């Protein structure tokens, strides 16, 4: 449902037109790394392998991040790379992984592998995993931890049409696991089996993505994104008690909205509250800021004058360096 209401005014937005904010020449494919950062060294990606008895392959004992590289007027830049690496180390601690690298070393590794692969618009995947060892669910006793940082080209995640016009989303029949069962704040590979079930269900129903509810019926997240909605000019999202991964894109949007003077509510919300919203959008490193135009046949506002669209433009202007107020979030290659 396109926007037919008069635009609300937020005078502090650096409101750059979408065509200007969008990075130019987004890659259409997902070409892989020629080089990879592997335990502190740049190596040829084709030479690296994982043992078929690696603990992570059997039990999902890996933690990871996703970081975007964007083209800017000063060359390619990584967005909030240090924040991503801090979260990686936090996830590793929750799973008992000992990683011998700090935030600075890992961030520099991401810069090095980006430079070595000669890319300017990509997705970076740092991943730490428990490797070869006995068949055991106590991997920290006997399995070495390997850390690698790989890259691949990535344009839009849910598609150019969804980014511009909105995604079609369904409410999954699968529920999100509770934060008392698993550390939902950790970005761990095993956790995403839950998301795979929901994503496959959405695919089978003909939708772009799915939103998962918690056991109590409150909203958790989409398959890999945080959920925002707008009602009466107020921006709403849920908090950590809703079993979410507190996204770095989510944090960026909240900070940009606060700077613009937008009223914000951060608390658990129900499916009913979300479905009464005027507009809904999803945020994530891969998905960026993607509007939702429909949930199970119910339409929501989209269009250039919605708050979500303004935040989308502000976000894209920030990650590409066009809005200089947050150059401190960019690490140039």
Predicted regions and their residues:
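Helix-start/capping segments and mature chain N-termini
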Residues: 1-101, 108-112, 135-333
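Short, acidic/charged, Gly/Pro-enriched secondary-structure junctions
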Residues: 107-121, 125-134, 152
